[in-house]
């Protein structure tokens, strides 16, 4: 997480006067290489999106990792005008999504390395709620959720809110969920008292206690 945060901060610092989307991709690729992080960053133009809309997906492949190939791929889905220069706020929003997606997948990589790249389960064939109940996903989402809560509430305030975890799943500030990942994750289950969500809450609490906010990009 510290290294990914450093990458994102360096890209933002090198874009103080604004940068185009293509320039940001170039800077990101260069920074990740300089930090010896092996991942691909791709862009996919989706004309169904408006000119300011985008989202980031990332994927980890245990087989590629085992074969010493690039194990993580980050894909930015967008419909950006290539000539538009982004300001600091837009750059920060973009890099935040890059940071979150990359940290999530590097957690999966650590999980995979720990079990010597043995595939844990056939995620593609599972119903989505069963996929989310996978221990690997619970652990990775706990990190992602803890990061979002630290951004929106601060670490210690977030820890206090954990006693009302069910309410936290739906909590919004300024019209935005304090943790979009938590809202989306909990929404996949019929009840907020589901055993998977109780386990997730415990994992999030532990992650909040351990996380160093100096290494959360924001």
Kindly give the residue locations of the regions a language model identified.
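Amphipathic, interaction-prone secondary-structure segments
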Residues: 29-62
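Post-HEXXH active-site segment of zinc metalloproteases
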Residues: 96, 112-138
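Hydrophobic/basic alpha-helical segments
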Residues: 5-8
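Glycine-rich, acidic and aromatic/proline-enriched surface loops and short helix-turn segments
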Residues: 108, 112-116, 146-149
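Zn2+-dependent metallopeptidase catalytic core
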Residues: 14-38
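Long, well-structured alpha-helical subdomains associated
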Residues: 130-133, 144-218
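Active-site recognition of the HExxH zinc-binding catalytic motif
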Residues: 100-113, 140
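Active-site scaffold of zinc-dependent metalloenzymes
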Residues: 52-96
């Amino acid at each position: 997480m510290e290294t990914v945060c450093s990458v994102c901060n360096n890209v933002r610092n090198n874009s103080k006067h604004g940068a185009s989307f293509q320039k940001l991709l170039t800077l990101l690729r260069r920074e990740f290489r300089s930090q010896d992080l092996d991942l691909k960053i791709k862009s996919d133009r989706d004309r169904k999106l408006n000119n300011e809309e985008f989202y980031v997906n990332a994927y980890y492949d245990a087989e590629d990792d085992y074969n010493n190939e690039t194990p993580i791929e980050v894909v930015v889905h967008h419909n950006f005008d290539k000539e538009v220069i982004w300001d600091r706020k837009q750059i920060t929003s973009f890099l935040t999504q890059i940071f979150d997606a990359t940290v999530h997948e590097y957690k999966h990589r650590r999980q995979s390395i720990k079990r010597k790249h043995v595939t844990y389960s056939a995620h593609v064939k599972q119903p989505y709620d069963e996929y989310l109940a996978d221990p690997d996903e619970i652990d990775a989402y706990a990190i992602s959720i803890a990061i979002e809560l630290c951004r929106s509430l601060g670490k210690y305030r977030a820890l206090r809110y954990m006693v009302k975890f069910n309410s936290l799943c739906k909590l919004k500030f300024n019209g935005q969920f304090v943790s979009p990942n938590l809202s989306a994750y909990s929404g996949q289950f019929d009840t907020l008292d589901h055993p998977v969500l109780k386990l997730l809450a415990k994992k999030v609490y532990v992650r909040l206690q351990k996380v160093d906010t100096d290494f959360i990009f924001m």
